């Protein structure tokens, strides 16, 4: 506490001097640059330590999964913003990131929260199938969509899910959260009477939980990864522009019925 009774400000992330930068206890120049991957650096920032080899493989896998998904609303928003403000690449990326909502890329935290809260205090031998059934029943009773299920494009199967779970299994990180997510998918499918396949955000929410990440930061995984993809969209916009064409066509087609013939 300070003399005025206020809590002293404190950060454990990094510090620097005129000739040194230290991040989470590691000298940036000597220990990290040229020695760790971008994914490992992100893990270090979030967890306060470098990952083990299995953790590195799994964390990098979920980050790679979230970098790119084509011409999504966030990518279009980034391109259009760059058209209007080419002096502000960071503004265009930010515009795209603001589009990472519950439909595209964002709800990793919803899935992680559902899983972490469902298993909070549960004993090691807990009946996961019973927990899954209870989660689905509660979500449906509240009129909510079950997090981590369904996709507007990948109707029958999200091809990223089996590969993510395979990587997790190969690295010893396919545990209760992954098993519960799969059981929730099965229970939701039975309750709905139609297929509700797991999507990538559900898989990533489960794997992030296996890695011990709190659900509150799990949407940040999508933010970090998709920023890379959005920079690539802006680079492509410089090489193969489409934003101006999108603007022109929307302007013409949306008001076509109002124009005199």
What are the functions of these language-model segments?
Residues 1-261:
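Non-transmembrane, aqueous-exposed alpha-helical and coiled segments at domain scale
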């Amino acid at each position: 506490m300070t003399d005025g009774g206020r809590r002293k400000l404190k950060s454990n992330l990094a510090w620097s001097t005129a000739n040194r930068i230290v991040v989470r206890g590691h000298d940036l120049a000597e220990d990290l640059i040229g020695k760790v991957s971008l994914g490992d650096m992100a893990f270090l920032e979030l967890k306060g330590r470098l990952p083990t080899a299995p953790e590195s493989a799994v964390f990098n896998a979920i980050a790679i999964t979230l970098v790119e998904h084509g011409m999504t609303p966030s990518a279009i928003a980034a391109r259009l913003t760059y058209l209007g403000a080419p002096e502000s690449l960071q503004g265009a990326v930010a515009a795209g990131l603001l589009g990472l909502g519950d439909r595209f890329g964002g709800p990793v935290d919803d899935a992680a929260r559902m899983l972490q809260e469902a298993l909070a205090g549960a004993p090691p031998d807990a009946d996961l199938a019973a927990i899954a059934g209870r989660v689905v029943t509660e979500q449906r009773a509240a009129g909510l969509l079950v997090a981590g299920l369904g996709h507007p494009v990948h109707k029958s199967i999200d091809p990223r899910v089996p590969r993510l779970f395979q990587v997790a299994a190969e690295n010893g990180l396919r545990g209760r959260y992954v098993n519960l997510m799969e059981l929730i998918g099965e229970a939701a499918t039975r309750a709905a009477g139609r297929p509700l396949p797991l999507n990538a955000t559900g898989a990533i929410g489960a794997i992030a939980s296996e890695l011990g990440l709190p659900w509150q930061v799990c949407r940040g995984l999508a933010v970090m990864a998709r920023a890379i993809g959005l920079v690539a969209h802006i680079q492509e916009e410089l090489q193969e522009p489409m934003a101006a064409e999108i603007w022109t066509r929307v302007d013409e087609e949306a008001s076509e019925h109002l124009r005199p013939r």
